[in-house]
A protein has these predicted regions:
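Membrane-proximal alpha-helical signals and transmembrane carboxylates
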Residues: 2-8, 14-399
Length: 399
């Protein structure tokens, strides 16, 4: 009996210990936090941004070494280029902590489906990293820029993307799963945020870029990249990108500016925005109604408007709604006529509204979308005016 117990114990221990057979020590890995993919002629050029743990540790005094290092490699396929990187890196690149993938603009113009295959297929890549596109720069040039405040440039790109999406609305964070799902929908176009290098790209790689009060080279998000199928076809301006975010119910907060009745301007802070898209068919003809409800506070007043009066608040509400409405309508028209791709999910709304009617038109959606009737309704409510009601320019009348 005792012998049987020992055998059972050994079997249990064998099962427990087998879990460590594939372990890899931290000092044996090169932790990749950002991956750049460019297309040079018929080859892929891969850039990996690898963290130096000793340089970002709070316990260790700062040295003159960079907190990250970039390695570059070329290959006929991305898989080959990554493996060839072991000839220059002291450790094998490890992608389980990847935070962001930067797609080069030239690659995006050719098509991104092939480039995404490995990172979607390989088990080592987690599926929660964001995907962005470089604009007027290669992915390599973007990942070579050292950034102030955030020691790791990948963190800077990720944090700026998140903060801008929440406070301004001209960017959207799109992870790899969301992008692949959109690319798989032949009736919908994809959108990803575009980033560019401001300043001399050659200076961005130097440590002095983070040692000056006025940083000479910066990474800046510049709008949304529009894809038709898997190909990049154009860039939306900051204003157009915000309009798309309103339509896609992505606005969490932003700023609106209106002209005052006499002269000067007034700024408001959007605190909440809710968008509902309704599709319908009339005599077989599709139509989209967009209802946007906005709540805001007065943020800055540079005119003599009297905010204690209801008619002034009504004026602010009306002008804000009018401004949002006009920008959205112009953006929709541009996307319909210039890009001819449904980045709003209007096709999905029509499918939900009437599956039978949608089935009749879905194969012709590409030709129907440019002439689709889209009606936008914007309602704005102003809830507060901050810690003071009127501007210092609004002087009370003498009695």
């Amino acid at each position: 009996m005792a012998k049987l117990n020992w055998i059972c114990l050994l079997c249990i221990l064998t099962l427990l210990l087998s879990g460590c057979w594939s372990k890899r020590e931290l000092n044996e890995l090169a932790i990749v936090v950002a991956l750049g993919i460019d297309k040079i002629d018929d080859e892929y050029e891969i850039t990996v941004q690898i963290v130096d743990p000793s340089e970002i540790s709070m316990r260790q005094a700062s040295t003159q070494r960079s907190p990250v290092v970039s390695y570059h490699s070329r290959g006929e396929t991305i898989f080959e280029a990554i493996r060839k990187m072991t000839t220059i890196a002291a450790r094998k690149p490890y992608f389980a902590h990847l935070q962001v993938v930067v797609l080069g603009e030239d690659l995006a113009k050719e098509g991104i489906s092939d480039a995404l295959d490995l990172i979607v297929r390989d088990h080592e890549f987690r599926k929660d990293f964001d995907v962005i596109m470089s604009h007027e720069a290669t992915a390599k040039e973007v990942l070579n820029v050292l950034t102030p405040i955030e020691k790791v440039p990948a963190n800077k790109m990720l944090n700026s993307l998140d903060v801008s999406e929440k406070a301004w609305g001209s960017t959207i964070a799109v992870n790899i799963d969301e992008l692949v799902n959109t690319l798989s929908n032949k009736h919908k176009g994809a959108l990803i945020s575009a980033i560019e290098v401001h300043g001399d790209k050659k200076l961005g790689v130097d440590q002095t870029n983070v040692q000056r009060v006025k940083t000479p080279v910066l990474l800046r998000y510049t709008g949304l990249a529009v894809f038709k199928g898997d190909k990049y076809i154009g860039l939306l301006t900051e204003s157009e990108s915000k309009s798309v975010s309103f339509l896609n119910d992505k606005i969490q907060s932003t700023i609106e500016i209106i002209a005052c009745p006499n002269k000067g301007t007034l700024s408001t802070e959007i605190t909440q925005s809710t968008t509902k898209v309704k599709g319908s068919f009339k005599n077989g003809k599709p139509k989209i109604d967009v209802h946007i409800n906005v709540e805001q506070n007065v943020g800055e007043v540079e005119c003599d408007i009297d905010l204690t009066k209801n008619k002034s608040i009504d004026y602010v509400n009306k002008k804000t709604a009018q401004g949002i409405d006009e920008r959205i309508e112009k953006t929709v028209e541009k996307i319909q006529q210039q890009y001819e791709v449904d980045v709003f999910g209007f096709g999905d709304a029509l499918h939900r509204a009437d599956p039978k009617q949608w089935k009749k038109i879905k194969d012709d959606w590409t030709s129907i979308f440019p002439d689709l009737a889209v009606v936008v309704h914007v309602k704005v409510t102003t809830q507060g005016s901050g810690t003071m009601q009127n501007s210092l320019l609004n002087k009370p009348k003498e009695e």
